[in-house]
Amino acid sequence: MEDYVYKTKPYAHQADVLKVSWDKVNWAYFLEMGTGKSKVCIDNAGILYECGEIDTFIVIAPKGVYRIWAEIEIPTHMPDRLNAEVVRWRPNPPAALKTALMSLAEPAEGFRVLIMNVEALSTKKGQRFLASVLRASKALLAIDESTTIKSPRASR
């Protein structure tokens, strides 16, 4: 982890959280809103990829938030050298996106990032797709805005 070169320099609190959490199997970032949890999570994924621990980074977020990961957070904080293929879930994708999505259900050749909206997990199609990606990869799974799935009895 000490050799990891960040794309955007972390603030002290972000570096501290990452230092204690980067190699944990299960972890939650209980930081205040606006303190850079997304950046910490992206850095964590980058570190784990460079250490050979993961080949796929999966982000589950609410519909209004998941596009921000693909369009802003990942491009801003994920180091270019990782050459991550970022794919955003769509239930009825055009042909080119369908090919990219289906490739996620195969063993990885490089670093992949899947961004899914949490609402997709309320559908059999979304559940089956995520399960196929998880079976084919060594993944870090991150849940943004986890209050949407906080109850064990929730349909998601």
Stretches found by the model and what they are:
Residues M1-L31, T35-R156:
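SF2 helicase/translocase NTPase motor core
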